[in-house]
Amino acid sequence: MKRFTWLLLAFALLVAPAHSANLKWAAQNDILTLDPHSQNHATTNSILQHTYEGLTRYTKDYKVEPCLATSWKQMSETHWRFNLRKGVKFHDGSPFTADDVLFSFNRIRQPQGTMQIYVTGIKEVKKIDDYTVDLLTDGPIPILLRNIIDFRIMSKAWADKTNSQNVQDYAKKQETFASRNTNGTGPYLIKTWEPDKQIVFAHHKGWWGKLDGNVTDVVYTPIKSDATRVSALLAGDVDLVTDLPVQDVDRLRKSANTKVLDGHEVRTIFIGMDQHNDELKYADVKGKNPFKDVRVRQALNMAVDREAIRRVVMRGLSIPAAIMVAPGVHGHSKDIDRVMKYDPNGAKKLLAEAGYPNGFEFTLDCPNNRYVNDERICQALVGMWAKAGVRARLNSMPFANFIPKILN
């Protein structure tokens, strides 16, 4: 039950000279933390990528290019050598060296964080000299250079000084110096963060690279209400909105004072079913877990009318999908990206075969402020599953509450 969603953004058209500029940016969500190794959360990652950098990064056309590493060589299938960029300074003025890469590797792997996925398969990082490191892997990793883009480097000296050697335990609501302060090597430093109010960026004048554009100061404001966010754009209170509600797209396209850019994202939205617990929590089935039976999972998949969601809920701005890899991403295959046919009667038969002729009841936890139309999509799923005899109780909540519940 997956879908590719559309990337929608709009910005106000302003007539201004091309000198340094301030950008007022709004989106639905706030970040969860400033700790770059704590939470694998899209909004948090998209904000922190301007402050903390990795060894590699993406170009505008989604290709890998050097960042804190200037070059690399694959010595063998399981051995990579990276040459580090010299002369790079952290925001506090301290130099970037191989020690920071080793420290960050050991830090990101700590179990209380959720960013370990970006170093999966890397068993060791070795320092060759101050500006050379080797990455040793468990086996061949063809996407290693892409994975480590989000392996962001923190200053070892700064972490030692501020007692930030350990990753914040977000699930336990821990607060640390690194969860409220930053010290990266990126083009922008974060001056202040007021949770649920605003984040203030300033250009890091000591950045090793060259700014693409003239934006020197940025104020990011999370605005949860779709209507309020769009009104702020039309009133000129913000310059850019990066998660437009689909119902306002046509109106904004027709406005002489705004421009809408759109295209499909590489993110895939999916419904996660608990296949771990022997007894399904928050359900009326006791002593067992229906989702462990592949026929039940297939039935719920078969009961979803993706085309109706695309047409009605998403107003044409989504792509039905059968696999996690999106079009445009290396590894996508049209041959296997074939959506299961919508068949509620077939779903009922599968449920009966699995021992649930009368269906069952369970709780569907759903964020209501993270993805475009997330709660409306969940509402549609509840109705579709009901036609197959499965009763889902919708439990929608802010994403800040959703993540700790899922992690726990």
Task: Locate predicted features.
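Periplasmic binding protein-like
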Residues: 25, 93, 239-240, 257-260, ...
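Aromatic- and charge-enriched surface segment that lines or borders ligand/interaction sites
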Residues: 70-114, 128, 134-139, 229-235, ...
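N-terminal lobe/hinge region of extracytoplasmic solute-binding protein
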Residues: 26-76, 106, 183-185
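Ligand-site clamp/hinge motif
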Residues: 176, 205-251, 294, 382, ...
